[in-house]
Structure formats: C-alpha cells, structure tokens
C-alpha cells in the first residue's frame, strides 16, 4: 500500500502503532538533476515491497503543482508528467500496489494563521521556510494547478481523496477512517 500525504505529523499519526519493519517513511527531498529528468524512476525506487506500507511525505505530485509554480521544473517536464502519470499509476496498481491518494486541503485563511503561529512560536519557528511565504503569495496559481491535477489525474482506479484539514485532528481521523474502511483485514468492522 502506498499513501500520499502532505504532512509528516499526519504520517506519524498513521504509523505510530505499526511495526517498523512493515512500513517505510519516504521523504525524498530536492531531486538531483538526473532525478528531475527521470521523475517516475525516482519514485519507483521509493515504492513499497510486497506486504509493506509506504507513507510518502510529498509525492510524485509535486511535479503537478509545486514544481511548475515555483520554477523547479520546465513546461515540458510538467506536460510529460501530466500525460504519463495516470498510466504509470495504472501499471503500479496492476502490479499489486494499493494506492491511496490523500490531498489534505487547507483554506488560505487557515494557512495564514498557521504560518503566523509558526513564525511567532519559539517551538515551531523552524518549521517555516522561505518557500512557505512564497507559496502564500501564489495561492491563486496553486489553486489553478491543484484543480487541473484533480481533473486530469483522478481516475476510477486511482481517485483523489480530498480531506478538509483546517482542523488537524478531524483531518487525521477522517483519513484514518477512510483507510481502515478501504483496507481488508481480519475481523474488520466498518466504522
């Protein structure tokens, strides 16, 4: 199973009681020049082996939103990604990967509140990056690219699950409930 997530704290919530040998936390960071030109190969290496769960802090979908807006990829790379990603995911699923794509959505007001709280907190100031401040100024572009991503990459076998994350705990519980209901396991009770 492969889960796409945006926040490391949500991943911690999901994985807190899992046995460490059965899941991977994947945070790839800034791509090398080669990885930037071989986007799908970069992510293929990070996928789970049979019987494992991988939690992706960010995912291949940074190519669909963040990278083109921030100038980290060119138009050709963006278009190539958008053209190929559905088939790539379809192949993953045919080869046994159970893919769940969560998108944790945050309102602009809530994003600004959280950024201000981080900026003014002695415990959280380090979480605020220069990119965070740039991103808020490009909110409309992010919204446009996000909508394009949903429209072009939500498929019947690989839909997006959009979670309102203005309230962090409700978002985590909602996504966990979704995942538990979707997953088959012994003595399952639908919640």
Predicted segment positions?
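Hydrophobic positions on the alpha1 helix immediately C-terminal to the Walker A/P-loop
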Residues: 9-10
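Intrinsically disordered, low-complexity polar regions and short flexible loop motifs
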Residues: 15
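Conserved nucleotide-sensing/catalytic segment adjacent to the nucleotide-binding pocket
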Residues: 20-82
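Conserved nucleotide-binding/hydrolysis micro-motifs of P-loop NTPases
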Residues: 31-34, 59-62, 105-112, 166-170
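A glycine- and Lys/Arg-enriched "phosphate-lid" helix/loop adjacent to the NTP-binding pocket
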Residues: 66-84, 92-144, 190
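Short, small-residue-biased leader/transition segments that mark boundaries at the very start
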Residues: 1-2
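Short glycine-/polar-rich loops that comprise or flank the Walker A/P-loop
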Residues: 19-23, 49-52, 93-100, 121-124, ...
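NTP-dependent small-molecule kinase module
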Residues: 121, 144-191
């Amino acid at each position: 199973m492969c889960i796409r997530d945006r926040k490391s704290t949500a991943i911690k919530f999901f994985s807190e009681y899992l046995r460490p040998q059965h899941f991977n936390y994947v945070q790839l960071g800034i791509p090398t020049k080669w990885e930037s030109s071989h986007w799908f190969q970069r992510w293929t290496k990070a996928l789970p082996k049979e019987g494992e769960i991988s939690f992706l802090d960010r995912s291949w979908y940074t190519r669909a939103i963040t990278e083109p807006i921030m100038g980290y990829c060119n138009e050709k790379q963006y278009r190539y990604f958008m053209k190929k990603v559905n088939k790539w995911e379809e192949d993953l699923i045919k080869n046994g990967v159970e893919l769940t794509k969560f998108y944790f959505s945050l309102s602009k007001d809530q994003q600004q509140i959280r950024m201000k709280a981080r900026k003014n907190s002695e415990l959280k100031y380090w979480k605020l990056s220069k990119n965070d401040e740039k991103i808020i100024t490009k909110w409309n572009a992010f919204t446009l690219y996000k909508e394009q991503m949903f429209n072009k990459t939500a498929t019947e076998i690989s839909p997006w699950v959009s979670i309102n994350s203005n309230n962090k705990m409700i978002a985590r519980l909602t996504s966990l409930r979704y995942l538990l209901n979707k997953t088959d396991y012994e003595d399952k009770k639908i919640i």
